[in-house]
């Protein structure tokens, strides 16, 4: 399938654009405060998008994560038109300017005391941040991504030089068949181009919207089971893999 718009998390984000992905691990018992925090930030993100400082924002709540130290509770995406815009936004971000803007945008919804209380709380225990860039994806079926949609997430560590070719030439065609069978909404393959100091040693990520697929439903080479199984085996051995499931709860869409 030909390359199309990168429609993974919001309606319009094209090849060449990047996403900054924050995997957020909360302090114990901080879930309600975290929702208040995101609701406070939401009008700020929407205004930044309107001013063309970024192109999108979305928050996913993890339903199922791997057993690991400080497993993430939420996944937050900020989308930018290119790497330069993302870097410029992060390098020039001024908290005092942002705070005043947030107060102005929320003056009819939250008091200054509420804002101050939330901002002074330690809600996030750790944030593992990755900047990712799209390599390729299937087309998207079933309309726009919306609140309540499900995300199947995979984080990979590349183990050999053939890994990307296996994703693009073995696994992507299999996911395209799952899409044609109505089992998924979209599959996307991204590469990590930057990360913060506490981020894990991951090189790539895959994302599947509304995944109802059975891996046994589709073979890559249906006429040769041995060759099909060998290709899949070598593809799986070309990377380390952890997976998780999440639900979309906030979006600029």
Where are these regions (language model features)?
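Short S/T/G/P-rich N-terminal loop/turn motif that feeds into the first structured element of a domain
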Residues: 16-75, 79-99, 108-253
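Sec-dependent N-terminal signal peptides
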Residues: 2-15
